[in-house]
Amino acid sequence: MDVIATTTTIVSDLDSRQPEIEAPIRIQPAKPISFSNGKRCHHHHLASEAVAVATYKECLKNHAAGIGGHALDGCGEFMPSPSFNSNDPASLTCAACGCHRNFHRREEDPSSLSAIVPAIEFRPHNRHQLPPPPPPHLAGIRSPDDDDSASPPPISSSYMLLALSGGRGGANTAVPMSRKRFRTKFSQYQKEKMFEFSERVGWRMPKADDVVVKEFCREIGVDKSVFKVWMHNNKISGRSGARRANGGVVVGGVGDSRQSVVPTNGSFSST
């Protein structure tokens, strides 16, 4: 009898504890954890519970859109209807104009916007990012390694443009100097010899006696191309001077009966 009574007592105790075991257990959600550079950091949402406050101003619904026009009803501010319910979108109508709240211009409250902005903490996730700036009271203190590790300040774009424009201008000024034509200077002896030879050949370069011309240029020390240019530049002045000296007759010209002959042996004679 004692055994049966004890068993009955144990069963009754289990029946009384059964509701406690079947009670649902609430599991608290874990807070988000982020790892930054090997350190565990908890996100602190400072003002996450703040709700943005917005007001709805004038109605912008175009009542003449069907006919291609533009007409407003003149409602200046959204007025909630008596059956307003934030959970029922159909009840969000204006009591003044009867339009839905979405047709009214939404205007955020600046004070509420500043309240819901969370504070941002500088937490570099790798070692390649720059460290945060020092506090204001430590800004003037510098370590001995700052001079070695500090990089030079960046060059502004205005200085770069000035440098490029200056370099471009220098290149432009140097180009005319490189293209300047070289002017050959002749001695008085060379001028007299070239003038005398040009008078004999009629101020024209003889193509048949090219050997004689080359020999003459070698004797006076002047290149053939240079002598040809000199003859071309002084042709007019040389012929006019010879015409004045001969009384209007040009040696080797059309009005002269004498013709200068340049033989192949280098001697000159007139016939």
UniProtKB/Swiss-Prot annotation:
Putative transcription factor. GO terms for biological process: glucosinolate metabolic process. The homeodomain differs form the typical one by having namely 4 instead of 3 extra amino acids inserted in the loop between helix 1 and helix 2. InterPro entries: Homeodomain-like_sf, Homeodomain_ZF_HD, ZF_HD_homeobox_Cys/His_dimer. Residues 179-242 bind DNA. One of its GO terms (cellular component) is nucleus. One of its GO terms (molecular function) is protein homodimerization activity. The record marks 231 as: Required for DNA-binding. Homo- and heterodimer with other ZFHD proteins. Interacts with MIF1, MIF2 and MIF3; these interactions prevent nuclear localization and DNA-binding to inhibit transcription regulation activity. Binds to ZHD1, ZHD2, ZHD4, ZHD10 and ZHD11. Interacts with HIPP30. Mostly expressed in flowers and inflorescence. It is found in: Nucleus. Keywords: DNA-binding, Homeobox, Metal-binding, Nucleus, Phosphoprotein, Transcription, Transcription regulation, Zinc, Zinc-finger. A zinc finger (ZF-HD dimerization-type) spans 56-107. The modification Phosphoserine is found at residue 16. It comes from the Eukaryota. This is Zinc-finger homeodomain protein 8. Residues 125-154 are annotated as: Disordered.
